Amino acid sequence: MSKQPENSFSSDKFFPIKQKLALEAVALVEPGMCVGLGSGSTAREFILALGDRVRTERLVITAVASSRISQLLAEAVGIPLSDHSLLQDVDLVVDGADEVDPCLRMIKGGGGALFREKILLQSGKRNVILVDERKLVPTLGKFSLPIEIAPFGCSSVQRILNKQGYFGEWRETSAGERFITDNGNYIYDVRTPDSYANPEEDMIRLLQIRGIIDVGFVIAKAEVWVGYADGSIVRKKEHNEY
């Protein structure tokens, strides 16, 4: 069983880079915007920075959170949230990613919120993905590929995945219990294969399996902002070798 990733935040040596990325991104927010809030450690810093602007500048916005954790944090820092069931166009979505390849294709879902994160990205007029340099990979698959799977018939879905060559583990909480997403589903973390040269093909193949809700591949129009250890930030908008 794979364990749900733990939050390290300030113990991460790249924490200052994440904060800098968040501050750069929060400057994009303008009055009246609807802002999509991602999940994960870098998105957390963005939410904190946005909450600070709401408090100190009396910035009038609305926001939609991609996870229960992000929702609770947004509420705690005073960011007004809109009804996610009424979600339509989102002016700006800010999120992170687990891996990014040279074509800006990504893997998301390390925090277990991949389905909602992808809905936000689909709705975003402008999508900004914040990552540090460790997330840049030549080919996707360095870590694992999260797949969200409905509980009903999940063992059958796993059998089909294995038959097609996708092997992994069901994600667990730190208490050793099956991890459950905000949508009430499970996460199967695929370890093998460990590289995806053509993730579009794998995504199509996987989404044809009944019971799979979504796959961690993100192939969408987005800007990727990369923070480096030397303090620099590089903004990528299209195919661009590292």
Swiss-Prot record:
According to UniProt, this protein's pathway is:
Carbohydrate degradation; pentose phosphate pathway; D-ribose 5-phosphate from D-ribulose 5-phosphate (non-oxidative stage): step 1/1
EC number, as in UniProt: 5.3.1.6
Task: Write out the GO biological process terms.
Answer: pentose-phosphate shunt, non-oxidative branch
Where are the catalytic residues?
E117 (proton acceptor)
Report the top EC class in one word: isomerase
Query: Which GO molecular-function terms appear in the entry?
Result: ribose-5-phosphate isomerase activity
Entry keywords, A to Z: Isomerase
What function is annotated for this protein? Answer: Catalyzes the reversible conversion of ribose-5-phosphate to ribulose 5-phosphate.
Quaternary context: Homodimer.
Task: Give the protein family.
Answer: Belongs to the ribose 5-phosphate isomerase family.
Q: What protein name is recorded for this chain? A: Ribose-5-phosphate isomerase A
Source organism of the structure: Chlamydia trachomatis serovar D (strain ATCC VR-885 / DSM 19411 / UW-3/Cx)
